[in-house]
Regions:
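Fungal secretory targeting signals
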Residues: 1-20, 280
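An often Trp-containing, charged/polar helix-loop segment at the C-terminal end
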Residues: 508-575
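Short glycine/serine- and small hydrophobic-enriched flexible loop segments
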Residues: 501-509
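Non-catalytic alpha/beta scaffold blocks inside enzyme catalytic domains
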Residues: 401-436
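Substrate-binding/charge-relay-adjacent region of secreted/lumenal peptidase catalytic domains
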Residues: 21-108, 115, 120-372, 376-406, ...
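Acidic/polar loop patches that form or flank catalytic/metal-binding clefts of enzymes
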Residues: 249-252, 370-371, 406-409, 414-420, ...
């Protein structure tokens, strides 16, 4: 398990030497990444100082108060100004002065981030470190394995980024599960072929959407995040709508942190983004949809070279959530789907906790944040990166954040069973949250044998946050989608998440039309009143830790092999399908009763 331990150390700044502490330190370079060369001192680098937020020890209790049905304050969500009042950020005065003393003048503020540009030589001295270039496949990134900050700033700074977070390698322009289909005729709204391909009509049947018609003017809105140079395509959505007789609807786009909306089929990466928007529209049409395209490098810095495409592959969660939190509630969708994640242990713990707290603040504002649980089952790497090379199950972040709703996957049709690639398990960073204590205890007490628990306990943390929370169809049969004007079949939990987002958007639509608040942070409600609105999945299992990457089918170099590693789908909550798949009509009646 990766941890961010504090050590005593020496910080060298340009102004004067100062004693400091090693703030974050990796025991080893993350799996798959290799050192290419040390960066030249004249190379440019852009970094962000994440200022500490105060009173975060009260975040969970406030979420409990507002998100637990039956409480007097249930659903009385906060707005932007309330968050800034209750959870203010530390002053940036000392941080900016520290940067100025080092000769850094290109500085700007974005939410609780202080962004700056400098040379590698200055950054190396400022943080008592050595920035180098590392490569993983097509990705090359400028990173370090540890850095220090002055003692006097430890209460003001959460972390510096990007430093020790390597993220994932560059992804292909199509999702790993995408397979091209022959040209197909325009489809009538029929579910006769659902055993072969999943279409919008199939989703109506599978999740009991009935004849419910959302009102585009109700105020319910749905969003999705795009990273790694992805952008959804307007023309492809129009083709998809025509194919399935969906009335014409487009989506809006907001660019964050240098994101680019590339509508050129020849150059765009659109596989994931198209999957998101097409499935959201398939479920929740005509509710407004917005795509948040987040780039990987701050755009504010003058006279500094932009990073190359190969340097722009991390999911910049900090910039993403800081941007969202900077907007008033009236300018935000009430449910946001995200289909990107990393092995939890590859995300430095400071960074993971910072991002998770930002997601919690979103929940306080009545925003439901969803995350696909991942497509690697119990795990792919299955080897610790703390220097001990210990075999272990591999949970995925941000799905392990207790303030997010993680969406796992099912397969097959009528009935659905657990998908073997649905990621799930237990976090090594976050403890089990209050809302799922009883459900997870029931699973461990009644559906896992003592021998299995004893065997698995050396590979997983049964006291950690358990995920996923819910699930929806992922693969086999595939979803039918449109990419670059052509028909493809695709899927994964990256499909399950936007499907569930569309359903949450419709539940918000029903509540808003009834004069009620949006659902906001969903998990306390899911594990109590809404549990009966899900169809329990009790067949199938997830697998992994067999030395093969289930997304690519290729061997994992240095991957851990754990015999018999799997999670079974069981009655009640389980770490493959969570509470099960949604029954919209049941859920609608339940949320309207609150």
């Amino acid at each position: 398990m990766l941890s961010s331990t504090l050590y005593a150390g020496l910080l060298c700044s340009l102004a004067a030497p100062a004693f400091g502490v090693v703030h974050e330190k990796l025991s080893a370079v993350p799996s798959g990444w290799t050192l290419v060369k040390d960066a030249s001192e004249s190379d440019t680098i852009t970094l962000s100082v994440a200022l500490a937020r105060q009173n975060l020890d009260q975040l969970e209790s406030k979420l409990t108060t507002l998100a637990t049905p039956g409480n007097a304050e249930y659903g009385q969500w906060l707005d932007q100004s309330d968050i800034e009042s209750l959870f203010p950020t530390a002053s940036d005065d000392a941080v900016i002065q520290w940067l100025k003393d080092a000769g850094i003048t290109q500085v700007s503020r974005q939410g609780s981030l202080v962004n700056f540009a400098t040379t590698v030589g200055t950054a190396n001295k400022l943080f008592d470190t050595k920035f180098s270039y590392y490569r993983n496949g097509a990705s090359q990134k400028l990173r370090t394995t540890q850095y220090s900050i002055p003692d006097s700033l430890t209460n003001s700074i959460d972390l510096i980024a990007p430093t020790v977070f390597f993220g994932k390698e560059q992804e292909s322009t199509l999702p790993s599960h995408a397979v091209k289909l022959p040209a197909l005729p325009r489809r009538a709204a029929t579910n006769s072929s659902c055993a072969n391909l999943i279409t919008p009509a199939c989703l109506v049947e599978m999740y009991n959407l009935g004849d419910y018609k959302p009102d585009a003017s109700s105020g319910s809105r749905v969003g999705f995040g795009s990273f790694l140079n992805e952008s959804a395509n307007y023309a492809d959505l129009a083709i998809y709508e025509k194919l399935f007789n969906i009335p014409s609807q487009n989506f809006s786009v907001e660019l964050i942190n240098g994101g680019v909306n590339d509508q050129n089929w020849a150059t765009a990466s659109l596989g994931e983004a198209n999957l998101d928007v097409e499935l959201i529209v398939a479920v929740s049409h005509p509710l407004p949809v917005v795509e948040f395209i987040t780039g990987g490098s701050p755009p504010f810095v003058p006279n500094v070279d932009e990073p190359t495409a190969a340097d722009n592959q991390n999911e910049p969660y900090l910039e993403y959530y800081e941007y969202l939190l900077s907007k008033p509630n009236s300018k935000l969708p009430q449910v946001i789907s995200n289909s990107y994640g990393d092995d939890e242990q590859t995300v430095p713990e400071y960074y993971a906790r910072r991002v998770c707290n930002l997601i919690g603040l979103m929940g306080l504002r009545g925003i439901t944040v969803l995350e696909s649980s991942g497509d690697t089952g119990i795990g792919s790497a299955c080897m610790s990166n703390d220097g001990t090379n210990t075999p272990q199950f591999t949970p995925t972040f941000p799905g392990t954040c207790p303030f997010i709703t993680a969406v796992g996957g099912t397969q097959s049709y009528a009935p659905e069973v657990a998908w073997d690639g649905s990621s799930g398990g237990f976090s090594n960073y976050f403890s089990r949250p209050w809302y799922q204590y009883l459900a997870v205890e029931d699973y461990l007490d009644n559906h896992v044998t003592e021998d299995t628990k004893n065997y698995y306990s050396q590979y997983t943390n049964f006291r950690g946050r358990a995920f996923p929370d819910v699930s929806a169809h992922s693969l086999t049969p595939y979803y039918e989608v449109v990419l670059t004007g052509k028909h493809y079949k695709s899927g994964g939990t990256s499909a399950a998440c936007p499907v569930f987002a569309g359903i949450v958007a419709m539940l918000n639509d029903a509540r808003l039309r009834a004069g009620k608040s949006t659902l906001g942070f969903l998990n306390p409600l899911l594990y109590s009143i809404l549990a009966e609105g899900f169809t329990d999945i009790t067949a199938g299992a997830s697998v992994g830790c067999d030395g093969i990457n289930p997304q690519t089918g290729k061997p994992v170099p240095g991957g851990g092999i754990i015999p018999y590693a799997h999670w079974n789908a069981t009655e009640g909550w389980d770490p493959v399908t969570g509470l099960g798949v949604p029954d919209f009509m049941k859920l609608k009646d339940l949320v309207l009763s609150l």
